[in-house]
């Protein structure tokens, strides 16, 4: 796994052994950040259900001011910390251990990226409900194309859906 563009372009980052996480594919990550390009510089970013931290690290590489990595899996937390240390970017990042639904509202940001494990469909709705109460400028949800997400949740309205293979990105603002 590698960083696609920006300050840390082509730098390798560790992944988590086994099937406990499903990293965002490089092509989908590139598409995401091509869309975010005008908004990422100087933004604050939350990578919720962070896994390896690849999405939040990509945000930092492309100019985000600060990123929060929300994750509960201990092995994933260790990998995120190792990846941040290898890039010497710890001062611009905060790793938050614990269930995302308990930590999400304590870390407001300009851009929030949600990528819950695909089988946890209720987690998507619950996270969007939380964000809908105190909406960020932009929320992006990575999900399986077969999952139907709401058009609106609280103050958030879906503005765009991008599909690639079995993956989709739903944008809310």
Where are the regions that the model predicts?
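Class I S-adenosyl-L-methionine-dependent methyltransferase catalytic core
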Residues: 1-173
């Amino acid at each position: 796994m590698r960083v696609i563009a920006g300050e840390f372009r082509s730098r390798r980052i560790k992944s988590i052994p086994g099937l406990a996480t499903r990293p965002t594919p490089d092509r989908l990550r590139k598409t995401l950040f091509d869309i975010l390009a005008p908004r990422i510089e100087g933004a604050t970013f939350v990578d919720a259900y962070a896994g390896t931290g690849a999405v939040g690290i990509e945000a930092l590489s492309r100019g985000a001011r600060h990123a929060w990595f929300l994750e509960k899996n201990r092995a994933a937390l260790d990998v995120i910390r190792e990846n941040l240390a290898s890039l010497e970017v710890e001062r611009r990042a905060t790793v938050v251990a614990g269930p995302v639904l308990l930590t999400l509202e304590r870390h407001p940001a300009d851009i929030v990226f949600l990528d819950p494990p695909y089988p946890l469909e209720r987690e998507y709705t619950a996270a969007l409900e939380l964000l809908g109460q105190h909406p960020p400028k932009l929320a992006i949800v990575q999900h399986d194309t077969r999952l139907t997400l709401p058009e609106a949740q609280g103050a958030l309205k879906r503005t765009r859906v991008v599909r690639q293979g079995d993956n989709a990105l739903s944008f809310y603002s």
